[in-house]
Amino acid sequence: GIYRSLDAGRSWQLMGLEKTRHIHRIIIDPTDPNTVYVGAIGSPWGTHPERGVYKTTDGGETWEKILFVNDKTGVADMVMDPTNPNKILVAMWEHKRDPWFFKSGGPGSGLYMTHDGGKTWKQLTEKEGLPKGDLGRIGLAIASGKPDIVYALVEAKKNALYKSEDGGFSWKKINDGNDIGNRPFYYSDIFVDPENENRVYSVFTYVNVSEDGGRSFRQLMPAYGVDNGVHPDHHAWWIHPTDGQFMIDGNDGGMNITRDGGKTWRFIGNLPVGQFYHVSVDNEYPYNVYGGMQDNGSWRGPAYVWRAQGIRNSYWQEIAFGDGFDVVPDPDDSRYGYAMSQQGYVRRYDWKTGNDYTVRPTPPDDTTRLRFNWNAAIGQDPFDHQTLYFGSQFVHKSTDKGLTWEVISPDLTTNDPEKQKQSDSGGLTMDATGAENHCTILVIEPSPVEKDMLWVGTDDGRVHYSQNGGQTWTEVTGNIKGLPKGSWIPQIKASGRNKGEALLVANDYRRYNYTPYAWRTRNYGKSWERIVDAGDVASFTLSILEDPENPNLMFLGTDDGLY
């Protein structure tokens, strides 16, 4: 939904539009602060009508939907003419994401323009100079100093940068080279200097700048091989309205500021914006905290210190690179451990020397292709710390800390071939990063009270257990009443007291089902008791934990917060 603050951000009030799920742009009429335009991109996971452009003229008390195409098309970008607040250009984007596939583009995508505050709209097509056929995501930028100059970064059969010199009535393709950007579904952001209509920034993995109105670009910020303190993968950009040398960059590593047009950058280090997938601790005293961060590696730091001034940034150490996920410190010697990254990579590290090496399982034969989830499964055997488990579509077991592996299960997923076409994913522009890998194992949970007892959950809704270290497996999916077929099973927590007892979390939001799901079994999955539903919490479930001393005290992590 959308929130409003009347005290400079100290407090916020919900003003509606909750069902839009995702809002991409908000524009306030500079002549009337009660008139606001909202560009709702909607949920990528499902079709729903609460998307498009909404308008309020009473400060958010009521809303009118003024532009709608269809229930799978939302607003990718929206700009207002700074000299005429009734003139707005909107990029509509048809897209759909499934757990196993992504499609950008379709007949719903297009560019629209209004001159009367949204009462009437004109769709701009190939007649105005835009590309023919289906379009994908479109990024827009208007030159505030000369608002007749408008740029459109268009995903199409051939991605290109288009320019209008008459306020959007006609368009010309000016650049279709690789320097305009990559991965349009993920980026497609373009910005123009308010003081120089020919200085254009394309913001993507790199940041490129044009000084000739987009005809050519040079690299302003390389992604790799430089030490400027700026993380690659850029998603937000701000240019000072009267000083084009002053810019702010928002990227996958945080926020950076330049005062000299991008020659030097200062990292803003006091914003807590890191995204941790998992958190773990070791057995030291004081203990250390470990975690893997989205696109920012895996880290280790003290929970507390016996020093004045507390924990400093310098006390934290990066122990592995990439998209960080689970970190498993060695219970016997926390100098060593395992850190995961995307595509199922796992490394054994030595944080004292900084050395590490890959211990990722390899296929059991030449004909088998392993499928690893973006956030793959790892488990440490609580009875034998030499033993490690790792998940692809199989359970892999190592008894020598990852040096060698054996497969100890059949394919525990549905192995649905229709959900294994990631090489075709992306829509108009192919995009196969591994984020849509499917029919994979999500969780491997060894029991801390029963040797050789393993629980396994998958991303296509299957739950198995083995009581003999993987020699045989029993599926209990059908016993979980109310579990939607094909749901994700991101967590199973085996009881620390009782054999055969476990907690299970499932979610199905990737298919536009935001219902919370959690169950408990006390008899090895023969029956399950549902312990949370929509009447208890506000959003889908992600994790669950039982207090080790008081079994009646439980914690539930949801997309909405902690319960």
Describe each PLM feature range.
Residues G1-Y563:
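Beta-propeller blade termini and top-face loops
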